[in-house]
Amino acid sequence: LLAVCLSGCMTDVQSVQCRRVNSLSPFGPAVMEEQGVGLSIKAFEQGVEDGSLAGHVGFAESVGMIAEALGWKVDKFEQQMKPIVTTVDRKSPYGFAKAGDVAGVNMTGQGYVNGELKIDMIHPQQIEPEMEGTHTGDYIVLKGTPNVSMAINPEVDGGIGTIAMMVNMIPHVINARPGLKTMLDLPVPRAIMGDMRDMIEK
């Protein structure tokens, strides 16, 4: 959604790249398991093949939403899931990966329009990324007129960001007309510092 908002000051958009580099360290055992933290490379590859590893979920939906907002028709979507292998032992509160094993997953996804790559999603996530010099952050690059780029360092904390978004959208969801809605249908998210009841339409 942030990429869509940034495109509002552009007269044309040629491509969109969204990259989120984040730490899995704050998350619990369920996330460690679904991201393959601590697995051997062979076990990780087997999990990708049999579908037991979730990795990041939502690239197809994000690509679809960006395309819909910009008026593009995606004719092909691809997604990849690769292990991030650590060269040092890494330990987080709920995860451990010894050197040579998997510390996280690098998810990538692409949306093509008329055979041309238009939407590029990149999402490496791992425990204790700083131990090998990786700094977290959220990055958006829009190519077009004018070019637009955005960087947030360090990353927006995934847990806090999710909780805040859900709470801040409460009055907008209440005010929405009945039906299935996406974030494109609702007002731009914002922190609500006042009384939410004042925002409910009578």
Question: What are these language model-derived features?
Answer:
Residues L1:
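Short glycine/serine/threonine-rich phosphate/pyrophosphate-binding segments
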Residues I127-K202:
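C-terminal helical cap and adjacent loop that interface with cofactors, partners, or active-site loops
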